[in-house]
Structure formats: C-alpha cells, structure tokens
From Swiss-Prot:
GO CC term, one of those recorded: host cell membrane
Membrane spanning residue stretches: 83-103
A Pfam family it matches: HCMV_UL124
Sequence similarity: Belongs to the HHV-5 UL124 protein family.
Chief location: host cell
Organism encoding this protein: Human cytomegalovirus (strain Merlin)
Topology within the bilayer: Single-pass membrane protein
Protein name per its UniProtKB record: Uncharacterized protein UL124
Compositional bias segments (type: Polar residues): 32-49
Annotated compartments: Host membrane
Underlying gene: UL124
Keywords: Host membrane, Membrane, Signal, Transmembrane, Transmembrane helix
Length: 150
C-alpha cells in the first residue's frame, strides 16, 4: 500500500509540474504598436499615456494580429483547464486501481492469516432448510441447493 501511495504522489507531482510549465510558457507580455501615432504600449508599463485617437486604434486589433495570436487547440487556449483535467484523469485511474487492489486483497487470504482459518469459512452458518414448504398445496415447490465451495 505504501508503494501505491508513493506512485500516486509521483504522478501528482508530475502533472502539477507539467501544468506549471505549460502555464509559464503561455504567459508572455503583449506589446501593441500603433503606427498611426508612433506610440508603443507595453502591458508591463503602466505609465504610458495614449491620446484618444490611438486608444481607439488599440482597442480594435487588426485581422492579422488576431490570426497570428489565435491558439490552435483547446490546450493552447486553456492550459490550466487542460492540466486540471489531466490531473483528474490520473487521480481517477489511481483511485480505481487502488480500489481494485483493495477488493482483491479482501477476496484472497493474506500472508499473515493461516490458510486453515480461510478454508474453514466463517462462523455464520446458513439456517437449515425447512422440511415442509410454507407454500400452499396447489403451488409446486422448487427446491434449490447451493453448494458451498471452500
């Protein structure tokens, strides 16, 4: 079980690292040039003052700028959402595998449990079947015996 939890931690760290890397790669400063007024505005410089005519030019991006910066896939558009979805998928797979190993370990005897105790079965015994069926006389009786494999 310790091995499974170590694998879970390693997978989660790997996914978190990939998410941080993809987010860092897509966070770039955007620079807008207005050739009509000769004013350059950088997103990192907040002290740039723009005249009213260039503010209107900056608010409407040209078609070439939109095409040049448009992402081509969902992972380019939403890197954080992609990383979170990947994390959820990995966590779901790990949970399913750990649940399956837990169920499997309960079905088989453990190494520490003596095999004789497993073969003897539990202390709860099935009640004996009644000799006479509680069904009325005109209803046919179907009796099924289920063998118990030990």
């Amino acid at each position: 079980m310790e091995r499974n939890s170590l694998l879970v931690c390693q997978l989660l760290c790997l996914v978190a690292r990939a998410a941080a890397t993809s987010t860092a790669q897509t966070t770039l400063p955007s620079t807008v040039n207005s050739t009509a007024t000769g004013v350059t505005s950088d997103s990192q410089q907040n002290t740039t003052q723009l005249p009213a005519s260039s503010a209107a030019a900056l608010s409407l991006p040209s078609a070439s700028a939109v095409q040049a910066h448009s992402p081509s896939s969902f992972s380019d558009t939403y890197p954080t959402a992609t990383a979170l979805c990947g994390t959820l998928v990995v966590v779901g797979i790990v949970l399913c595998l750990s649940l399956a190993s837990t169920v499997r370990s309960k079905e088989l005897p453990s190494d520490h449990e003596p095999l004789e105790a497993w073969e003897q079965g539990s202390d709860v015994e099935a009640p004996p079947l009644p000799e006479k069926s509680p069904c009325p006389e005109h209803v046919p009786e179907i009796r099924v015996e289920i063998p118990r494999y030990v």
